Amino acid sequence: MASGVQVADEVCRIFYDMKVRKCSTPEEIKKRKKAVIFCLSADKKCIIVEEGKEILVGDVGVTITDPFKHFVGMLPEKDCRYALYDASFETKESRKEELMFFLWAPELAPLKSKMIYASSKDAIKKKFQGIKHECQANGPEDLNRACIAEKLGGSLIVAFEGCPV
């Protein structure tokens, strides 16, 4: 079911910047986005970047100690959102970083909001080619480290964002 909602160019640019890791200077790496939250525009016709709802790589360990906990705290309690999160995790063999796409549709969100976000998900996913991991979360219990580790690879994952799972 398509909703006719468009995806803003800035959303696509941010996805590309997060997906493509160029050889960068330490200053450029600090400005790279760790997480970004997207919402619908006021007229509900376009998916846009939510103002002020991002975590930069340079903030991790400086102003933000636990980036995933901070990310979860940025999600609204009573409305839906889309998000990209650059997950850092360890398997038994190696350390990895992979993008995760989230549809946040909490129980307390209005039914109309849940319907439009669910029906617009394909529009944003088509723009996000190459995403390996997708997660729909309906409450904070869906966003604990064990649930996320399961999405990333189950029993192969030994740590997520530096914390054992």
Swiss-Prot record:
Keywords noted in UniProt: Acetylation, Actin-binding, Phosphoprotein, Ubl conjugation
Q: Disulphide bridges in this chain?
A: none
Among PROSITE patterns, the record links this protein to: ADF_H
Q: In which tissues is it expressed?
A: Widely distributed in various tissues.
A Pfam family cross-referenced in the UniProt record is Cofilin_ADF
Annotated positions of the N-acetylalanine modification:
A2
Modification note: ISGylated.
The name this protein goes by in its record: Destrin
Q: Which organism is it from?
A: Sus scrofa
